[in-house]
Amino acid sequence: TYSLPFVRMPTLENPIQTSISMFMWTDAIERGPEMTALRDGVRGKDKLDVPIKMIWNYAGNCLINQHSEINRTHEILQDDKKCELIVVIDCHMTSSAKYADILLPDCTASEQMDFALDASCGNMSYVIFNDQVIKPRFECKTIYEMTSELAKRLGVEQQFTEGRTQEEWMRHLYAQSREAIPELPTFEEFRKQGIFKKRDPQGHHVAYKAFREDPQANPLTTPSGKIEIYSQALADIAATWELPEGDVIDPLPIYTPGFESYQDPLNKQYPLQLTGFHYKSRVHSTYGNVDVLKAACRQEMWINPLDAQKRGIHNGDKVRIFNDRGEVHIEAKVTPRMMPGVVALGEGAWYDPDTKRVDKGGCINVLTTQRPSPLAKGNPSHTNLVQVEKV
């Protein structure tokens, strides 16, 4: 897609080069010093030296709701000798916010001035001016104010802020952006009109256009500079990484069933494959607490009529979805749009457990696993075996 060269907030260089997959953060709390480059995908070092001891969770719900295997995460976070401090900053009392040691309110979009970037669609890009409508309520501060206060106490305020407020940074970045995008109006004009759009002057985006026109002069970022069918980099990884049984990394695009597949012996106990999907009433878990959206777009488990008939399940019946990791109670949607042997839950529903940890909100991550995908060490959210019964 076409995007505008709008200048963004500069970032300081992080002196720490060691990193892990975001999905592995619970493992880094539980067994950090055991995690290695060859077994766990640690980058920048052969192994982690220390576990995670503090979490700063800003405007995110990955602490609980959007992270796999909620019950395991809950147990890890219960022990405050492991992760000793959790700071959460948000506008809503999310599932993640309930696990905070320090919980701070963030300013809403209506309470501060900002730019909305990353707005592009096909051959058109746009920038939105998000103006302040009301003053921050009570003692709310913007995240820029919070981090500036932290920088002040750490002795690096000038290096961090460069002497600018949030609005002054916006004006500074906008002036730089006007040099790259001459069509931009003045700051005050843009503030009044609220949005700026620009179409791709080339008409439409052509993927890898320069490479296609001259592959020698414009190589890709692959080791060979070409589109690779056989990946030597993957071959090297497959030969050196320590993979658990069932995990496969191959230099060629091949089929591999993976763990918790229909071929897994666990299939006898949990015969249904549970997959997730992005639901129309939410962006992940954002808007998952809005009552009118929840009423208009009910959270349901989709199931094929053949699987439903075997279990005496009719459309709208309350069912229990369960495996060794947890249990969810939710209504069933019986539909031929699902393949036999497969059920589905829209991801992002807000976790709502009872006293026995049975979730009544339809949160798929009660049932997902924290076993990472083989290569990226990422979220295997569609790889879950479950059983379904009528309640």
Regions found by a protein language model. Give the residues of each.
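Extended redox/cofactor-interaction regions of prokaryotic respiratory oxidoreductases
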Residues: T1-Y99, C107-Q112, R199-R311
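Hydrophobic alpha-helical scaffolding
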Residues: K45, C62-Q66, S120, Q132-K141, ...
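Alpha-helical scaffold elements adjacent to nucleotide-binding pockets in ATP/GTP-utilizing enzyme cores
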Residues: R72, Y99-I102, M146-E149
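Phosphate/diphosphate-binding loops
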Residues: E75, K81-L85, C91-T94, F129-A151, ...
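Flexible glycine/proline-rich, aromatic-decorated loop/lid segments
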Residues: S95-N130
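Short strand-coil-strand connectors
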Residues: S125, P223-S224, K268, F322-G326
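Long, contiguous, secondary-structure-rich segments that constitute the structural scaffold
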Residues: E139-Q193, S285-Y287, D291-W302, L306-V391
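Conserved small-residue motifs centered on glycine
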Residues: F196
